[in-house]
Swiss-Prot record:
Protein name: Capsid vertex component 2
Subunit and partners: Heterodimerizes with CVC1. Interacts with major capsid protein/MCP and triplex capsid protein 1/TRX1 at the pentamer vertices. Interacts with the large tegument protein/LTP.
Family: Belongs to the herpesviridae CVC2 protein family.
Entry GO CC: host cell; host cell nucleus; viral capsid
Subcellular location, record wording: Virion; Host nucleus
GO BP annotations listed: symbiont entry into host cell; viral genome packaging; viral penetration into host nucleus
InterPro entries: Herpes_UL25 (IPR002493)
Species in which this protein is naturally found: Infectious laryngotracheitis virus (strain Thorne V882)
Length: 572
C-alpha cells in the first residue's frame, strides 16, 4: 500500500506521449492508494506544473510587446526623417525655381526684342508712342506737355521698366545711385539674393530688383489689414472736394467744385490742394503734420483689437484739424455727447456724414456708403495721402519741363546713364533720346516776348488730367503711392536730417530692403506668416509717414526737396 521513498513513479499515460518516470524530490515518503494512482497523481500535479496553453499565451504577449516596441522605434525614426524632408524639398525646389525664373526672364526679353524688331518706327509692345491729335485709348498716359503719350498693357511702371531694359540691351541703364545702393545693401545682407536677381559678380542694376523695389514703394499707402469698398485715394479725393466746397458759399461756387462724376473731381485735385494750402499758411506758426505717436500701435498700422485708435491720436495734425473744422470728418460721440451739442446744434447737423453722401452720389453701383469716421486706419490713410499730395504740389510748383532731357527728371531719357563723371549737355547729346523725350533743340523756357514763364500749377493739372485719370480708370484700387512711387522714396530719404553715412545707410532704409527681400524670396518665407509680412510693410508705411511730416514742416520746402532728390539721384 505504501511506496518506498524516492521510488520512481509512473505518470499517467497520454495517448500522444510515451510513458515517463519521475522521482519526487521529497524527504517524506509518498503515500498513495494502489488503485487509481494515475487519477490522483494527475490531480496532485495539476496545480504545480505550467500548462502548455498558458505558456503559449505568454509567448504571444511577449512577441506582441516586442513588435510594439519595434513599431514604436520605427515610427520615431520615420518622424525624425519626415522633419528633415521639407528642408531638403525646399532646397531642391529653390535650385529648380531660380534657373526657371531666369529662363522666364530671358524668354520675356527675347519676346520683347522680337516685337521691337518688327516695329519700324520704334514702337514697342509695352510702351507706345502716338502722334499728337490721335484718338487716345484708356491705357494711354501723358506725363508732360512737351512729351509724347505712352501706352501700357497692364501696369505702366512695370511696362516702362521692361521696355527701358529692353531698349538698353547690354548697355548701361541707370535709375540713380540710390537704387543701386539699395541693391548693394540687399546683396550684402543676403548673398542668396544674387542668384534670384541674376547679378552674380556684377555691378549692374537688376531689372527684377527695380520692379520689386517699385512694387514695394507703391504699396506704402496700402492698408494690408481688412477689406474695404473704397480705396484710400478715393476717400482722399472726396474729402478734398467737400473741404473745398465748405469754404465757398452756395451762391459762389468756384471752378472745379461743381462736379458730377468722380473723374472730374480727380482733374481738379490741384485746385482743392490750393484751398487747403491757403488755410495752412494762415496758421503756419502752430502747424504740425505729425500724429501723437505715443497713442499709435508700435509695430502695426491698424489697431490690433479693432478699427479704432486711442482718443486724440489725430488731434495734433493740421490736416485733421482742418477736416474736422469744416465738417468733412463728421463729429462722433467720441468727440462730444449729444447732450453737450444740443444747445448749439439742435438738429445735430454735425453728426451728418457728408462723405457718405458724396460716395453714394459718385459710386451708386457700390450701394454701400463710405462711413469714414468709423474707420480710423482709413482716416489715417486719408491724412497721409493729403500730406503726400501737398508734397507733390510743392515739388511741382513752377517746375520747368523744358530743361535738358538728361538733367530733367520728368523725361524718360534721364534714366539712360551718362558716362562716369560727365554732366555736360555736349556729352548728353551723344546719347540716344528715349521714347517720350523731346530733343533739346525744341525746348524753351521763354514765351514769345522772351519773358520767363511761370508754370505755377499748370504741370500738376496736366499730370492729373493725362496721367492720374487714365491710371485710375485702369486700376481704381490704386493708392497715392501707386500713382507716384517716387514720392514714397522721397519721403523715406526726407525723414533723415542730413545725409547718413554709408555705414548707417541700413538703419534708415531697412524697412524698404526687408520688404523687397520678402517679395524676392516668396518661397523661402512661406512659414514666416502674415504677421511678419504685415509688420515689415507697416514699418515702411511708418517711415514714409515720418518723412512726409518732416518735409512739410521745414521752412524752405523747395530747397529740402531738391536736396533729397539729389540724394536719390546720386545715392546716399
Amino acid at each position: 500500500m505504501f511506496r518506498p521513498r524516492f521510488e520512481p513513479m509512473n505518470l499517467p499515460k497520454d495517448s500522444n506521449k510515451p510513458s515517463t518516470l519521475m522521482v519526487l524530490a521529497d524527504r517524506l515518503n509518498f503515500i498513495s492508494c494502489a488503485e487509481g494512482s494515475s487519477k490522483y497523481a494527475s490531480k496532485l500535479f495539476e496545480g504545480t506544473l505550467i500548462d502548455a496553453e498558458i505558456m503559449t499565451n505568454r509567448a504571444r504577449i511577449e512577441d506582441l510587446e516586442r513588435r510594439n516596441r519595434a513599431a514604436k522605434a520605427a515610427l520615431e525614426q520615420l518622424e525624425n526623417m519626415s522633419a528633415t524632408v521639407p528642408v531638403h524639398v525646399s532646397s531642391a525646389l529653390q535650385t529648380i525655381e531660380y534657373p526657371l525664373e531666369t529662363v522666364i526672364d530671358v524668354l520675356d526679353d527675347l519676346a520683347q526684342r522680337a516685337v521691337q524688331e518688327k516695329d519700324i518706327v520704334g514702337s514697342y509692345k509695352t510702351l507706345d508712342i502716338r502722334a499728337p491729335g490721335e484718338d487716345v485709348p484708356a491705357n494711354v498716359i501723358w506725363i508732360v506737355k512737351n512729351g509724347e503719350p505712352l501706352t501700357f498693357n497692364t501696369d505702366f511702371q512695370v511696362d516702362f521698366l521692361t521696355t527701358s531694359f529692353a531698349i538698353a540691351g547690354n548697355g548701361r541703364l541707370g535709375f540713380g545711385s540710390w537704387f543701386r545702393a539699395l541693391q548693394t545693401q540687399l546683396l550684402d545682407n543676403n548673398k542668396a539674393i544674387a542668384r534670384v536677381l541674376n547679378v552674380m559678380g556684377d555691378t549692374r542694376i537688376s531689372g527684377r530688383f527695380m520692379k520689386t523695389a517699385i512694387r514695394a514703394l507703391r504699396s506704402a499707402m496700402e492698408i494690408y489689414a481688412g477689406t474695404r469698398q473704397y480705396s484710400g485715394f478715393e476717400a482722399t479725393v472726396l474729402c478734398l472736394l467737400h473741404y473745398s466746397r465748405s469754404r465757398q458759399s452756395a451762391s459762389n461756387i468756384r471752378h472745379g467744385l461743381d462736379v458730377s462724376i468722380f473723374e472730374d473731381a480727380l482733374r481738379h485735385v490741384p485746385t482743392y490742394l490750393n484751398y487747403m494750402l491757403e488755410d495752412i499758411r494762415a496758421e503756419w506758426g502752430s502747424v504740425t503734420f505729425s500724429f501723437d505717436r505715443s497713442k499709435l500701435p508700435v509695430n502695426f498700422f491698424s489697431p490690433i483689437d479693432g478699427r479704432k485708435y486711442s482718443n486724440g491720436v489725430f488731434d495734433p495734425h493740421i490736416v485733421y484739424q482742418l477736416l474736422k473744422r469744416t465738417g468733412t470728418l463728421s463729429t462722433t460721440v467720441r468727440d462730444i455727447t449729444k447732450e453737450t451739442l444740443l444747445p448749439i446744434d439742435p438738429d445735430f447737423v454735425r453728426f451728418d456724414d457728408p462723405i457718405a453722401a458724396l460716395s453714394i452720389s459718385f459710386f451708386p453701383s457700390r450701394r454701400t456708403p463710405l462711413i469714414l469716421h468709423e474707420d480710423d486706419p482709413l482716416v489715417r490713410t486719408v491724412i497721409d495721402s493729403i500730406s503726400l499730395l501737398l508734397v507733390l504740389q510743392k515739388l511741382m510748383f513752377n517746375s520747368n519741363v523744358y530743361t535738358s532731357t538728361h538733367l530733367n527728371r520728368f523725361q524718360p531719357s534721364a534714366f539712360f546713364e551718362l558716362p562716369l563723371g560727365t554732366q555736360s549737355e555736349q556729352e548728353a547729346a551723344k546719347w540716344p533720346v528715349a521714347p517720350g523725350s523731346r530733343p533739346q533743340a525744341t525746348a524753351s523756357t521763354f514765351d514769345d516776348n522772351g519773358q520767363d514763364m511761370a508754370s505755377r500749377d499748370n504741370n500738376l493739372f496736366f499730370l492729373f488730367e493725362k496721367y492720374v485719370v487714365p491710371m485710375y480708370r485702369y486700376d481704381n484700387r490704386c493708392e497715392v503711392t501707386g500713382f507716384f512711387p517716387g514720392l514714397a522714396a522721397l519721403c523715406i530719404t526726407g525723414r533723415v536730417k542730413g545725409i547718413p553715412t554709408a555705414v548707417r545707410l541700413g538703419e534708415y532704409y531697412s524697412s524698404l530692403c526687408n520688404l523687397i527681400e520678402l517679395d524676392l524670396r516668396k518661397t523661402s518665407h512661406v512659414g514666416s506668416g502674415a504677421a511678419a509680412v504685415l509688420a515689415v510693410h507697416d514699418s515702411l508705411t511708418g517711415d514714409v509717414e515720418e518723412g512726409v511730416s518732416r518735409l512739410l514742416e521745414v521752412f524752405d520746402a523747395k530747397k529740402a526737396f531738391e536736396r533729397n532728390i539729389e540724394d536719390i539721384q546720386r545715392g546716399v
